[in-house]
């Protein structure tokens, strides 16, 4: 929106970096660390608020001792949060394509240059683009975004087992993501050049944006996916353990 207010349509059509598809991929990822924890928390907040207003909080807490109920709640929170994130991205795409020029309006050289930046060789999205074109690359990115939503919502899932307070459920995951992003960035800057590549890769994997970047750029996927998988699994295990304990001793914040 700020770009649209500062530049005319003619100015936007002179620079291919203002093309809609470029803004979609590189504009959204710069804000994903901020918006992902908030968007993925919406289904959890909706359920918690409905439980509080209906006065069924303690009843639900007791039912969470049932294995099927607990599994259903866990799956709903994870999948619903990821779906909200993908839906938010699709709305962003619609707005972007409505206000920014199509890539086809630029010269052949500009299109080639932008495509080489959007779909670099050796990246997952680049491989998908060369095999199935732009639709395949876009679907791959949506899949990665969905998985990232599950990873983000796992932390929210854990926080929801500790408290029913909406500020705790929203702010703690946001603080965690922002802190990890800042710590990873500072460590990456201050690491000496003679530090082993493995340490560099581990530090980079701590960055919340690294998971999305693993689909867009030719990076080492092992440490990034391992970190997010382990983090998600630990959050789910902690959620199940805490909810079972809550159902027995009935403590709520």
Regions from the PLM with identified roles:
Residues 2-51, 75-153, 157, 161, ...:
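Secretory targeting signals
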Residues 44-62, 66:
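Transmembrane helix boundary and interhelical loop/hinge segments in multi-pass membrane proteins
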Residues 64-78:
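Amphipathic cytosolic juxtamembrane alpha-helices at the membrane-cytosol interface
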Residues 65-67, 149, 165-169:
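Membrane-helix interface segments
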Residues 77, 174-178, 232:
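Residue-level recognition of pore/gate-forming positions within transmembrane alpha-helices
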Residues 93-108, 165, 189-196, 243-252:
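Transmembrane helix-loop junctions in multipass membrane proteins, especially transporters and channels
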Residues 158-162, 229-253:
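Junction motif at the cytosolic side of a transmembrane helix
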Residues 166-180:
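Central hydrophobic cores of alpha-helical transmembrane segments
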């Amino acid at each position: 929106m700020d770009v649209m207010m500062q530049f005319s349509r003619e100015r936007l059509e002179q620079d291919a970096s203002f093309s809609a598809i470029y803004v979609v991929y590189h504009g959204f990822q710069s804000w994903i660390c901020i918006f992902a924890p908030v968007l993925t928390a919406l289904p959890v907040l909706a359920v918690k608020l409905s439980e509080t207003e209906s006065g069924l909080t303690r009843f639900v807490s007791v039912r969470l001792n049932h294995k099927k109920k607990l599994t259903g709640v866990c799956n709903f929170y994870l999948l619903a949060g990821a779906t909200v994130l993908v839906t938010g991205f699709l709305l962003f795409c619609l707005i972007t394509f409505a206000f920014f020029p199509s890539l086809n309006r630029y010269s052949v050289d500009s299109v080639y240059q932008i495509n080489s930046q959007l779909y670099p060789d050796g990246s997952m999205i680049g491989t998908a683009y060369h095999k199935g074109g732009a639709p395949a690359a876009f679907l791959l990115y949506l899949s990665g975004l969905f998985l990232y939503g599950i990873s983000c919502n796992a932390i929210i899932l854990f926080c929801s087992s500790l408290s029913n307070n909406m500020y705790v459920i929203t702010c703690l995951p946001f603080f965690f993501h922002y802190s990890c992003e800042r710590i990873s960035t500072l460590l990456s800057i201050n690491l000496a050049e003679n530090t082993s590549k493995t340490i560099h890769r581990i530090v980079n994997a701590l960055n919340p944006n690294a998971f999305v970047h693993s689909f867009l750029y030719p990076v080492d996927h092992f440490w990034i996916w391992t970190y997010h998988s382990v983090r998600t699994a630990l959050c789910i295990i902690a959620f199940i353990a805490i909810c079972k304990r809550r159902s027995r001793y009935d403590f709520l914040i």
